Amino acid sequence: MRSLIIAAALLALGGNAYAGGNAANGKAISEKVCAACHGVDGAKPAGPENPILAGQYDDYLVKALSDYKSGKRANPVMKAFADPLKKKDIEDLAAWFSSQKSSLHFQR
C-alpha cells in the first residue's frame, strides 16, 4: 500500500505531459516560423501585439498552439502558422520557448 501511495505522489509531482519536447528542434522551427514576430528565443517580440513566449509554461504553449491549429482559439495569423505544425513540432517549440529566460514571471 505504501508503494502505491509513493508511486501516486511521484506521478502527481512528476511534471507536465510535454516534457518530451526537443528544445533543439524547437529552436530550429522557431527560427523558420516564429522569429519574425516573437524573436528566436521568444523574449524580444517585434511589436507590443506579440506576446513574450520565453519562460512560458510548456503545457500552456502546447495548448495555445493546438487551439490555434484547430480553430478553437481564433486568430487567423496564428492559425496560418500553426496549421502546418505537427504535434511533435508543437511540443518541440514549447520545450524551446519554456527553456528560455524571461523577465516575466508566469503564475499557475
Language-model region placement:
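Positively charged n-region of N-terminal signal peptides that target proteins for export
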Residues: M1-L4
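Cleavable N-terminal signal peptides
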Residues: I6-A7, A17
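Sequence/structural segment immediately N-terminal to covalent heme-attachment motifs in c-type
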Residues: G20-D41, Q56, F106
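Gly/Gly-Pro-rich "capping" loops immediately C-terminal to redox-active cysteine motifs
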Residues: K27, A43-S70, K79-P84
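C-terminal capping alpha-helices of c-type cytochrome domains
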Residues: S70-R73, A82-R108
